[in-house]
Structures are given as C-alpha cells and as structure tokens.
C-alpha cells in the first residue's frame, strides 16, 4: 500500500467508532488461549509442537469424513461448499454482488459465497489456521476455513494490485462549517434521507423511542433486524405497518461484532434502496438502536442540503501503517459459525491508499450508487478484499471513496459524538466472537449531557445509549430537543425490556430461568390468594396453566425493580382461563456488619453472572443462578488508602467454599473475581462475607436455585440427586477451609447437612416447596383481560405493569408538522 498524505498527529478529540484506541498499544490481539467454558477441544493443544497439532487436527477431521474416501480438505460427492468467486481479479464478481431485489432472502454469513469445482488442497501449516480449525464447532465452518486458507496460500483469494481512480495526489478533506443561524432557514429543495437502522437485541421500547425522535414523513426508514433477534423483528414488523415510508428487510443476517456480515448488510441495503424507485432519497445514514439524535431533523436537513455533494466519514487520525497494524488489515479473517476466525497474514494490495475509522457514516446517493453497482477494478477488488477483513465497515467505504473518482467529496467528520472511555471499553470483551482484542464505546450518563450542548461542531447523533443502563440521559436529551412531556405523563421514569416472549419457545430459556419464572408464578398466585381472597370465595384463587407467556425486566428511575411474569391461569371459582401479570422484586441482601466496623471504603457488594466490565454491572439482572453456574463476586469502593480485604464464600450448610484476599488500591472503584469453584454448587442461600483484618465489614447473600426443570422437562430424581447435592465430598476446591469455621463462628450442624442431603432428592411439589420463598417478594398481581376476581386490578391501570401506558415509546399518528415527537 502507499499513503498519499503525511503522517498526522493523533487528534485528542477523535470520536471514531473503530476499535483502534490510542492507548491500546500493548494488547495481544490474538485469541488462541483456551476458552473458559468447557469444550471438547483440548486446551493444551496450543502448547504442543505445531506438527503434533496438525496430526491431531488431521485425525479429528479425518474421522468425520471416514467412509467417504476423502482427504481432510476434500469433500464427498454430495457435500458442496458454498459458491465463491474463482479468483480475485474476475470482474464478474461485482455483478454477483450487485443487483438483487430487496425482497431477496439471505443467510447470515458475512463472506461472499464461493463456487469451486475442485476444493484446493494444501498443507495447513499456519498456527492461526490450525487454531481456528481446532476451535470451530461445525464441519461446514471447518471446511470453509480450510478452503479459504488454501485458496489464499495458492494466491487465488486476495487481489495483489488495485487501480486508483482518484485524480488527487493526496487525501481530500473538505471543511464544512456549522452555522447555528443558517440552518434555521429551510432551503427550497431540502434533501431527503434514507435512514438504515441495523438493530439487534430485545430493547424494542428504546428502539421505538429513538425512531420516534428521528421520524419525519419526508424521509425513508429501512430496518434490518439481526436474524437471531426474532422478538425484536416481530415488534419492528408491527410498528412499521403504520407508516408508508418504513420498510423492513425481508432478508436477515447475523451481524456479529467485527464481522464481515455487517458490511454485507450495508451493501445489500444500499442495493435495495437504489432499486426502490418510489423512494427518492439523497443521503444514506446508518444508525443502531443505541443511537439518538442530538439536533433536530430540521437542523440536519438544512445542513445536509447545504453540503449535498459531500460524503461524511470519520478517519482514524493517525498514520496509515499504524492503523493497518492495529486494525489487523494485514491479516486474513473469515466469518462462519457467527465468529471471525483469524487465519494468517496477507499483503495490502498495491496501488491504493488504505484508510479507515468509524463505521458510522453519511453517504450521498451518487457515491452509494458507485459502491453498490460499479464493476470497476477498485470496487470489485475491494469487495473481495474486505469480505475477509475484520471490522470491514470501518475501512471499506473510506478506502473506496479515497481512491475513487468521488475522492474530492470526502469530509473527515461523520457528524457523531461517540462516548469513548478506553480504560473501561477496551477489556477484550469480544474475544468469544472475534480472534482479536476490540474496544467498544460506553453508554452515556446524565453527567455527559453538556457534551450535546456544544454548538461549535456539526454533530447530529450520539452513541451509545442504553435505557437498561441509564434512561435518564435519554429523557434529558429528548426534552432538550423537543420539549418536556405534559405534567402528569405516565411512565416517563419507567423502563420495560422483554427477556422472554411465548413465540420464542421455552427452548430459548435456560433451565434456571424457567425454574425461577415458574416459582415466581406460584409466589404471585399465593399473594393473590392471601391478599385478595375472602372466606368462602374462590373468585381470586387460581391454578397455574403451562409455561410463562412473557417476561419483562422492570426499572424505575434507573433502578432494577424486578421481573414481570405474564402467565395463564384457571380461575377456580368459574373454571375459566385468565391471564395475569405478577411483579416479583428481589429482597435486599447486602448488609453492613453490626456493629459497623471502622472500615468505610466498601459501598456495596453483589454476586451474579455476566459481569459487564465496561458498564460495571451484571447483565444477569436479578442474579438468577443454578447449581452449574459460575458466580462472580463484585465490590464497589469509595476512595481511600490502599487496603487488603478478605472475601469468604459460605455455602447453605456453612461449608466454606472459598476464601481469598483482594488488594484495594486507593483509586479503585470496583473489584470483581470469579472463584474457581467445583460444581455443582449446593442449592440454597449462600453468603459472601467481606472482612478487614478479620473483622466483619459486610456480607451479601445470593440464591443458588435447585432446578425443577432439566432440558425444559420436569427434573427426574436421578438428575436432581446429581445436581442438588453439592460437589463430591463438599469440596469446592482442592484446599479445605474447614479450620476457619471456628474463627468465623460458622458451625456446621449435622442435622442441617442431613436435611440438605434429603432436599437433593426432592422432585415435584416437594422440590417446588423447597424452592419458593427467601430472596424474592411478590409485590403485586394484575389481570391483562377479563377476570372473575372482583378486586383484581387491570394491568393497564397500574403504574408498574408492562401493559401500563408508556407514551414516550408509543408510536401514533403523524402530526401536522410531519413528526411523531
């Protein structure tokens, strides 16, 4: 490659979305260490000599093809690999990747599909390819890895030289000015925008609120929902039917972080939009559900109308050689099994300048047409090159634009603010998805609001926002743009997020979640019977029917309030089906020692799973844990002198499972640690004690739930005994901590141990009775429809139910000014 511009100083205000942080120089980007979860593949593999790895790999793959008379890299007569281009220089590839109707169905793979009569065979000698083959789960993926590696090794995959069509010697960077006054006057021919929303997850209400904020009748909205997010897809289909200028892609891909599939999604969306002749759009803007506007639609339209010939992309702001190295552009990647596998080195094609930065951009129609439909050497070969690239959307459009005839239209600004906090966001949190160490921006909080009020630079969107983490900042921004909702508007401080919906099927739930949801239903019905029932009346007594219908997380003022379980029941008085919703709230389990110690740094302690080091919270809201889970202990600290504390984990019968010391530095805010406990954990209420100089400071409790379901079926006695008796000999670790029991006044009661042993054999109603109680409270119950219980409230009239009014996220008719908000 060559660069057409001198090296630039690193910009301190760079807000690019790419994963090449300025302070991330010394991280090993490889991902070849064994994974933490148990796998069939042997973790010591990476340490063995390369030749032995190859032998084992050959045996493994060969065993699967046994009887087919094929070598490791061969295929049986009926096993056809996905079609793929024969060679990078083939100009027909651009046609293959171009014109398709937007009604096309598509899979979720990111790499272009290959067609080859003969599978290339070669000696797979690269350690990265061997590692990928060893870790890939499906046979199809292993074949793709082998095929791609061999084609690359034979020089059939990557373009060596690419034509540059930009007439400029260096990189163009048009300056654009932000004039607060000028944008108040709408031009006579305002631009119309195609908003492409690429969304995933389950935060449908946050998506609807964002959509409400960006909607205008003059623009167009094309929505792609990740093919793994079926609940969100159902919600999007439902609200999109209300508006003629909203369409949902009929094809769906699995747009994994860093994957080639995201670029495929953008390119296919562009082709679709260009073929919609009834949508005369001028600009393409990509957004996610974690974005929010920070200026109004009128301001955005006035600005883009003034610069309608420009393309807005944010560059990395550092020299190209370093960018290529840190972004792994000189490495070959392949996406399959919803993972990006690193397969080895490659060369950057000669003849062009490689650029990159943020994968959030605003592109004009003329350039989108060029990228989508051109079959010239640059576009064709860049599509091939970036089909095997990590984070391709962070570089493909930059590189094509900078080397194309449109190069003089580039503005080095993507008109966004991104909330980077490198210390928190660069925790290699995507290593389970990508063979690479990546970064991600943080969620905005109320203390960041001043950043949206700056008027010097043209910025129109910000990210990231997550209502499940902090909704207050979204409310502040929404009011800043569009004014406050009327006084007394319900639901403004509430947030609901679905975690289960009946069409998902119970197979989508873990046995722990299914167990707990059924327990919550029983607790709710017990509450209804005790608080609503009158003597001699059965009208408020119910019998549960089937599995939960839906489950929501409920937050109020950014505090988790518990689960809302919608479920079907039979009313015992009239023998008719009704549908109720039960609100379950966790009890407070953190307790400061009494009398309090003079150690004042500890503010809070919690145990859970799915610790998010970036946002510093447990994503397993409510801490639903079962015997086979691996809990993490978290502590939150105030500032103070360096200290060492002792953490002790105690099981339900006072067996000390683990003890360890933590050094708390003076500036530490959070610590977390997952002790390597032998499984299964004994069901019941556990205690985690925190001591300073062996003086108790505080303790927190957590429930390990015994499972009433195994593989979604009622658990059998032999399964219950195996899962609910604790680890063999009650040994959670090789080392015994029994000598600490007298020191901590933790006495092991033989009767208690015997009762725990009996509990382990429980199934059916006995098991259910053991489970309920303790750590959760049924706060309220309501009916979603008609009910024979005269004192049962209707869910839509409560403040807490997922059926209660939520005007901030509800989508209605278009207002006279063309907006929804």
Curated annotation (Swiss-Prot):
It catalyses: UDP-alpha-D-xylose + L-seryl-[protein] = 3-O-(beta-D-xylosyl)-L-seryl-[protein] + UDP + H(+). GO terms for cellular component: extracellular space; Golgi apparatus; Golgi cis cisterna; Golgi membrane. Residues 9-25, 41-58, 76-87 have a biased composition (Basic and acidic residues). It is a single-pass type II membrane protein. GO terms for molecular function: metal ion binding; protein xylosyltransferase activity. Residues 1-821 are lumenal. Its cofactor is a divalent metal cation. Belongs to the glycosyltransferase 14 family. XylT subfamily. This is Xylosyltransferase 1.
């Amino acid at each position: 490659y060559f660069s057409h511009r001198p090296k630039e100083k690193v910009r301190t205000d760079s807000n690019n979305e790419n994963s090449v942080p300025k302070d991330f120089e010394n991280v090993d980007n490889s991902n070849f260490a064994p994974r933490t979860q148990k796998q069939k593949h042997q973790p010591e593999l990476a340490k063995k000599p390369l030749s032995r790895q190859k032998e084992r790999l050959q045996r493994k793959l060969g065993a699967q093809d046994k009887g087919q008379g094929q070598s490791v890299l061969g295929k049986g007569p009926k096993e056809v690999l996905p079609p793929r281009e024969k060679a990078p220089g083939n100009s027909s590839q651009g046609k293959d990747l171009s014109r398709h109707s937007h009604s096309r169905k598509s899979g979720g793979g990111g790499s272009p599909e290959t067609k080859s009569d003969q599978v290339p065979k070669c000696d797979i000698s690269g350690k990265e390819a061997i590692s990928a083959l060893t870790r890939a789960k499906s046979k199809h993926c292993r074949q793709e890895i082998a095929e791609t590696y061999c084609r690359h090794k034979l020089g059939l995959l990557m373009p060596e030289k690419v034509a540059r069509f930009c007439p400029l010697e260096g990189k163009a960077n048009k300056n654009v000015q932000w004039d607060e006054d000028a944008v108040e006057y709408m031009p006579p021919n305002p631009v119309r925008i195609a908003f492409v929303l690429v969304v995933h997850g389950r935060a449908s209400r946050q998506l609807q609120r964002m959509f409400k904020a960006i909607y205008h009748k003059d623009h167009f909205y094309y929505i792609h929902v990740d093919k793994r997010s079926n609940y969100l897809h159902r919600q999007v289909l439902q609200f999109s039917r209300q508006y003629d200028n909203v369409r949902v892609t009929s094809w769906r891909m699995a747009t994994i972080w860093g994957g080639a599939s995201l670029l495929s999604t953008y390119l296919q969306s562009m082709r679709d939009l260009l073929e919609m002749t009834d949508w005369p759009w001028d600009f393409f803007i990509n957004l996610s559900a974690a974005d929010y506007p920070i200026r109004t639609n009128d301001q955005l339209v006035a600005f883009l109308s003034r610069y309608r010939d420009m393309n807005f992309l944010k560059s990395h702001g550092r020299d190209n050689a370093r960018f290529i190295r840190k972004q792994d552009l000189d490495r070959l990647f392949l996406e399959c099994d919803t993972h990006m596998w690193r397969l080895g080195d490659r060369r950057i094609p000669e003849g062009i300048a490689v650029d990159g930065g943020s994968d959030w951009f605003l592109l004009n129609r003329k350039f989108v047409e060029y990228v989508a439909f051109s079959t010239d050497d640059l576009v064709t070969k860049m599509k091939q090159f970036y089909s095997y690239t990590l984070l391709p959307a962070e570089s493909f459009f930059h590189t094509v634009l900078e080397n194309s005839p449109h190069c003089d239209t580039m503005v080095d600004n993507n008109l966004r603010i991104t909330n980077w906090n490198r210390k928190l966001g660069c925790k290699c949190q995507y290593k389970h998805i990508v063979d690479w160490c990546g970064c991600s921006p943080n969620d905005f909080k109320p203390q960041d609001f001043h950043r949206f009020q700056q008027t010097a630079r043209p910025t129109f969107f910000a990210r990231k926002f997550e209502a499940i983490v902090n909704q207050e900042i979204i409310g502040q921004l929404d009011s800043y743009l569009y004014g406050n909702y009327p006084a007394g508007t319900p639901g403004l401080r509430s947030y609901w997020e679905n975690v289960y919906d009946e069409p998902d099927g119970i197979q989508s739930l873990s046995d722990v979640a299914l167990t707990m949801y059924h327990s919550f239903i029983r607790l709710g019905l017990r509450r209804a019977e005790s608080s609503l029932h009158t003597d001699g009346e059965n009208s408020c007594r119910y019998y549960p029917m089937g599995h939960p219908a839906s489950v929501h997380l409920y937050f109020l003022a950014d505090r988790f309030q518990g689960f809302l379980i919608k479920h079907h029941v039979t009313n015992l008085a009239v023998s008719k089906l009704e549908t109720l919703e039960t609100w379950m709230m966790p009890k407070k389990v953190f307790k400061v020692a009494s009398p309090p110690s003079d150690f004042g740094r500890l503010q809070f302690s919690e145990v859970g799973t799915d610790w998010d080091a970036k946002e510093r919270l447990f994503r397993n809201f409510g801490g639903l844990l079962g015997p086979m889970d691996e809990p993490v202990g978290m502590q939150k600290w105030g500032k103070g002198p360096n200290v060492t504390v002792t953490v002790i984990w105690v099981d339900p019968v006072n067996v000390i499972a683990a003890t360890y010391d933590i050094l708390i530095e003076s500036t530490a805010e959070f610590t977390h640690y997952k002790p390597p406990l032998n499984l299964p954990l004994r069901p019941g209420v556990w205690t985690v004690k925190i001591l300073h100089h062996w003086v108790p400071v505080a303790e927190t409790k957590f429930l390990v739930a015994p499972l009433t379901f195994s593989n979604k079926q009622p658990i059998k006695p032999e399964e219950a005994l195996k899962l609910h008796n604790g680890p063999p000999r009650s040994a959670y670790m090789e080392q015994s901590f029994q000598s600490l029991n007298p020191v901590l006044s933790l006495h092991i009661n033989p009767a208690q141990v015997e009762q725990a042993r009996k509990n382990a054999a429980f199934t059916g109603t006995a098991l259910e009775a053991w489970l309920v109680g303790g750590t959760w409270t049924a706060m309220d119950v309501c009916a979603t429809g008609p009910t024979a219980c005269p004192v049962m409230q209707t869910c839509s009239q409560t403040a807490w139910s997922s059926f209660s009014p939520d005007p901030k996220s509800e989508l209605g008719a278009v207002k006279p000014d063309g907006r929804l908000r």
